[in-house]
């Protein structure tokens, strides 16, 4: 059995294959930088039991050469869960690049709760500008669009305050508490992006 996972901060898609049959599962997202070992274990526990696992290829947010400690943490948790020796944990961007181009060449992009892009060649990333996460960057991502929307609405630059609050069943106070007192502000802000699309005019 081989497992391939594609994980952002919000959701993770798992493909489990024996070479003949493939099953797809979804769990909450795993960001190796943001999540503790306990949180990673909770996400892994959402998977159904698998047969003997030969290899796990995990492509996830917060993994890869930029974050060696977080990647090692992810590998440890995957090994503890699946009990296999063959574990690879790489950035979700590399997973997207390999899925798009295989060993070819081109520009691969991720646009979800976060955002990232790269130039890839031969199944490897050869050039990448760091996305910097939702506080410092992630331009164009759901979290950045949501952050900019909330900012514009409450500063009066976007005259849709009542429509926004009604559409999401929120108050100003609730928004501030969710962003500054609860974890995963990026996951809270990203679902506001469709509101931007609905009011493009």
Residue ranges and their predicted role:
Residues 157-201:
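A mobile "lid/hinge" subdomain adjacent to the ATP/sugar-phosphate binding pocket shared
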Residues 2-42, 51, 125-127, 131-132:
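Short glycine-rich, Thr/Ser-proximal phosphate-binding strand/loop in the N-terminal lobe
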Residues 12-17, 98, 109, 115-120:
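Short beta-strand scaffold segments in enzyme catalytic cores
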Residues 10, 61-64, 113-116:
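Short glycine-rich anion-binding loops that position phosphate/pyrophosphate groups of nucleotides
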Residues 92, 112:
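Active-site glycine-centered loops adjacent to acidic/histidine catalytic or metal-binding residues
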Residues 2-6, 53-57, 88, 106-110:
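Short glycine-aspartate micro-motif
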Residues 49-89, 100-102, 182:
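Short beta-strand-loop/turn "lid" adjacent to the catalytic site in phosphate-handling enzymes
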Residues 125-169:
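Glycine-rich phosphate-binding loop plus the immediately following alpha-helix
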């Amino acid at each position: 059995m081989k497992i391939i996972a594609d994980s952002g901060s919000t959701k993770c898609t798992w493909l489990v294959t024996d070479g003949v049959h493939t099953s797809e599962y979804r769990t909450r997202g795993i960001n190796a930088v943001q999540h503790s070992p306990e949180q990673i274990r909770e996400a892994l526990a959402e998977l159904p039991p698998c047969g003997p696992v030969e290899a796990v290829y995990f492509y996830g947010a917060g993994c890869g050469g930029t974050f060696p400690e977080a990647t090692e943490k992810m590998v440890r948790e995957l090994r503890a869960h699946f009990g296999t020796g063959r574990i690879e944990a790489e950035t979700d961007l590399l997973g997207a690049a390999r899925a798009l181009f295989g060993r070819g060449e081109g520009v691969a992009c991720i646009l979800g709760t976060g955002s990232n892009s790269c130039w890839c060649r031969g199944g490897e990333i050869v050039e990448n500008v760091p996305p910097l996460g939702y506080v410092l960057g992630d331009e164009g991502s759901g979290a950045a669009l949501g952050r900019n929307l909330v900012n514009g609405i409450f500063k009066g630059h976007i005259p849709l305050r009542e429509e926004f609050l009604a559409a999401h069943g929120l108050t100003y106070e609730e928004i501030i508490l969710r962003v500054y007192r609860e974890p995963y502000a990026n996951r809270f802000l990203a679902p506001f992006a469709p509101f931007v699309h609905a009011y493009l005019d």
